[in-house]
Amino acid sequence: MSRPIHFEIHAADVERACTFYAAVFGWTYQDWTDFAGMPYFGVESGPENQPGINGAIMQRMRGLEAGPGAPVNGAVLTMGTDDYDRDHATIVAAGGQVALPKAALPGMAWQGYYLDTEGNVFGLHQPDPHAA
């Protein structure tokens, strides 16, 4: 676990944010709303043969400030892992806190969110086609 593999930009108005980033950076989108159960648009940030990562623009969850059970007011990097439980233990031992617990993205992966020691949110993602 060391490289970002995905980002999420949280937005009050997802359509407005998608329009902005398309105009500024030329990003294109895939609508993953049905899969995510909320407005969630996969970002294709550029050609696959160029450096960079893809991500998403998603509906900001309700609340006032970042913290366990509260919304994110910014962008979130998601780190890839081949062993979610091992890296969960490492994060907690280093002083991180669970923001949203490990959950299945059915047929795709295990995903969870953490707070670092400064209150910043980051994700942890383990691909697993058998996640349920």
Language-model-detected regions and their locations in the chain:
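Short beta-strand micro-motifs in enzyme catalytic cores
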Residues: 39-41, 75, 108-112
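Mid-chain, well-packed structural core segment of small domains
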Residues: 65-94
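N-terminal beta-strand motif that seeds the catalytic metal site of vicinal oxygen chelate
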Residues: 1-19, 74-79, 126-132
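Vicinal oxygen chelate
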Residues: 9, 30-32, 88-132
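A short, structured beta-strand/loop element
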Residues: 52-59
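Core segments of cupin and vicinal oxygen chelate
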Residues: 8-52
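A short, acidic/glycine-rich surface segment
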Residues: 59-67, 132
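Short connector loops at helix/strand junctions that flank enzyme active sites
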Residues: 2, 50-52, 70-74
